[in-house]
Amino acid sequence: MTKTVALLDYGSGNLRSAQRALERAGAEVIVSSDPEVCTNADGLLVPGVGAFDACMKGLKNVFGHRIIGQRLAGGRPVMGICVGMQILFDEGDEHGIKSAGCGEWPGKVERLQAEILPHMGWNTLEMPTNSPMFEGISPDERFYFVHSYGVRKWTLETDDLTTPPEVVWAKHENDRFVAAVENGTLWATQFHPEKSGDAGAQLLRNWINYI
């Protein structure tokens, strides 16, 4: 059975690139900002390009933060890409502007501590083992990044009653940052799987199979 993915249209992100990649991975894609469509699809993908503050304003204009929260409360899968991952955290701090995020994870998006920014191009990950997100992907695969900001500290506390998220790290120069998170029905990547060749295509297939 073909899975339906709502690609959230809130004025940010390369929708066509993401749509084509999802369709190649086997999904039926609906580009929409309609709350009913986005809430009822099998999966919701949240893209994002640009500044954290601008993306949050666009998201709130279409009630995207509520859509994300409602889906997760009901156990329905959501995936964020690039700034679409960043806005899932508590706060963004860019160019001196502090903005509240969706608050699904604690933590702050801040400027990377590196000489050369943006971090643009292909990079490896500290690849996890036994991860549904990275199933079928070689540990030495590279993924495509374009960003100057990221989450440099993971602060979510866990206990014996909950399954801890799978947090995947990468490094630009000597600065380590969160490259992906697999947290039950909430997946997210700082890199662009839709621009990451065969490895990115496999990751999207893994997500579609999961939903």
From Swiss-Prot:
Keywords from the named record: Amino-acid biosynthesis, Cytoplasm, Glutamine amidotransferase, Histidine biosynthesis, Hydrolase, Lyase
Pathway(s) it belongs to: Amino-acid biosynthesis; L-histidine biosynthesis; L-histidine from 5-phospho-alpha-D-ribose 1-diphosphate: step 5/9
Domain of life: Bacteria
One Pfam family matching this protein: GATase
GO BP annotations listed: L-histidine biosynthetic process
Enzyme Commission number(s) from the entry: 4.3.2.10, 3.5.1.2
Record NCBIfam families: IMP_synth_hisH
Complexes and interactors: Heterodimer of HisH and HisF.
Protein name (database record): Imidazole glycerol phosphate synthase subunit HisH
Organism: Corynebacterium glutamicum (strain ATCC 13032 / DSM 20300 / JCM 1318 / BCRC 11384 / CCUG 27702 / LMG 3730 / NBRC 12168 / NCIMB 10025 / NRRL B-2784 / 534)
